[in-house]
A protein has these predicted regions:
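Short, low-complexity Pro/Thr/Gly
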Residues: 1-190
Length: 190
């Protein structure tokens, strides 16, 4: 007699059979623009997806401009990433992309309402204030976003999963940040 499983039970069995789990990496910080961060994926289990959380705290200073307020757009939180890549030591790189292009690519796959900034909730998936009011002394700007980098075609694609526990496999995530002047699109005089 065949056993009837619910969708939730099938999903739980798939997660159990493929040994999917979340493994955190150490937090790293950048003190100035133009820097590069490198994360090495631990040699444990299988890799199907990488989540990268970027939390930015910037200081925006007003220069000679008469304007004291600038508006941000939907791609502002992603503009600070100049290059994002996942590199394997066999020469394959599933991602070599800049932040804005990644946001546009992800909008095809994900719900745009969670991908693009919410201006009210600082704890959401992506946050950026709608407007920045700057002074000559400087104004703090806080932005937050999460990059979801799938390595497989879909969640049920066992062929695309990378065997990270192999001693020969080396997986690195490299994040190149823009310089301070290119992190935001701002008018002259700022």
């Amino acid at each position: 007699m065949a056993q009837t499983l619910t969708v939730q039970q099938r999903n739980a069995l798939f997660a159990q059979a493929t040994r999917q789990n979340i493994q955190g990496l150490t937090r790293k910080s950048v003190k100035q623009g133009g820097s590069t961060l490198t994360f090495e994926i631990p040699k444990a289990r299988l890799l199907s997806k990488v989540w990268l959380e970027v939390d930015a705290k910037l200081k925006v200073k007003k220069g000679t401009s008469s304007t004291t307020e600038i508006a941000t757009d939907k791609l502002t939180p992603y503009q600070m990433i100049r290059r994002l890549s996942i590199d394997l030591n066999n020469g394959w790189s599933p991602y070599v992309i800049d932040g804005k292009s990644f946001a546009i690519l992800s909008s095809i796959r994900q719900d745009c309402h969670t991908l693009f900034p919410q201006h009210e909730d600082e704890t959401g998936y992506c946050y950026c204030p709608a407007k920045i009011t700057a002074s000559e002394a400087g104004t703090s700007l806080h932005m937050h976003t999460v990059f979801e980098l799938p390595v497989t075609l879909n969640d049920r694609d066992p062929i695309g999963i990378i065997l990270a526990q192999s001693p020969e496999t080396l997986i690195e995530i490299k994040v190149d940040f823009e310089t301070e002047n290119n992190m935001l699109t701002i008018p002259d005089g700022w």
